[in-house]
Amino acid sequence: MSNKFLTSVCCISMLQLPLAITNSANAEWESSANVGVFSEYRFRGAKQTEDAPAIQGGFDLSHSSGLYLGNWNSNVEFGNTSIEMDFYAGYGFNIGDISIDIGDLYYYYPDNSGQTPNINSNEIYAIASYGAFSAGYHYFTTEWFGVGDDSGTSYMQINFEYPVSESVTISAHAGSSKIEGVNGSDYEDYSVSFGFDMGDGYALGLDFIDNSGDGAVGSAFASGAVVSFSKSF
């Protein structure tokens, strides 16, 4: 559940070309795409692939006005559910030196459509960034992946990112999930990550993940590390 599927090579080749759509205001659209292989898929500290590798990818369209929309995909392991497709749209703008991002994110699981419980979910979010720091608030307008009350589950996060060199970046993350209507399921997640820019859009990643959710959903919240190799277009 990401924020985060392997797009066909044909589609990726098309998406790496910037879109230049001009209207009367000479506004521009630009596109980007990404694909990666991960040792496992984690969502806010929780395992999504039962320790199995994940292939993930997506694409984005952004407008010079600040509007954007995109799609992100991954394999998952939830019983009969094997695919996650995320669709999002939002608006980014600046207030002085602070960057603000507001938007809507829909988590869609094609294998789960029509089943009970329905784990397809929707959240709205607001994220503020200043220098090396960012903080975000996410609010579910539906049930939290088929769990809890009709709406009201929330997630708060704070992040720090520091470029050690031109090719190495270190980042730290802390998040807090408040699961509405399910006693004892609130938890926090933490991570420290290292990113290695290999040039030409290639990157290596190493994430160390921990959380306080062992009592909520069992082994899905075990601590661990994730290794990744990705390509951006």
Positions of the model-derived regions?
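Outer-membrane beta-barrel proteins
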Residues: 2-13, 23-233
